[in-house]
Amino acid sequence: RSTPKPSSAASDVYKRQVLTKLQSDIDFSSDTFPYMGVRSGVISNIPARVIRVGFVGEIGYEIHVPQLLGEALWDLVLEAGHEFGIQPFGIESQRILRLEKGHIIIGQDTDAMSNPNEIQMEWAVSRDKPFFVGGRTISELERKPPLRKLVGFLIDDLNSPMPQESHLVLDGTKMTGRVTSCNYSPTLKKIIGLAYVPLEKADSGSTIVIKSSDDRSVEATVTELPFYDPKSLRQEL
């Protein structure tokens, strides 16, 4: 049985400097600790497992420690980051940042019928394994084009009603898709979101119509993902 472990995420341009200030036997340099790497060691005498992640679109580290030591580590990180202006951020900020980066949330941007091809995550399926659960189904689905795609969309008109999760994408009076995520992007100064649309509307530049809560029709433009930092330069600082 594993010990319950709280996690803390450090995600700004100074996070490597902050963690380096803490006494640790983990080398946080980019060359030895690449993106999506995992390291185990000690941080300020606290045993820790560290994962280099980028869910919010910046270089970041997720730190897992024994539950009783979580608050102590939190205090140490805030103290080490004080000179850099470190500030905690909450779930709402995280949700906006991950949306700007086009990262999906399983169960929100996916459903029981979703497959890797529909959500543009074919890269996440390893082809090196001789067998894995769901492999045969995925192979069968790849034999024909998908009926829908999860795409990004932009709304330039900030006076438009902001679509909400599960608002419908319409073609005339016909329901052709639905919104899975939507929010205002302070970085882009636009309304951005994710939605399932039919394949013929999945190309960048296509116009889709979303039905809002007040029964108004909102036009949105399909765009390439991610919305922010498409070359992921911010994750390699």
Question: Can you describe what each PLM-predicted range is?
Answer:
Residues 8, 50-53, 173, 189:
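Compositionally biased, low-complexity repeat tracts
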Residues 1-14:
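Single conserved hydrophobic/aromatic residue that forms the stacking wall/gate
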Residues 11-142:
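Glycine-rich, acidic
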Residues 114-237:
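Glycine-rich, small/acidic residue-mixed loop/short-helix segments
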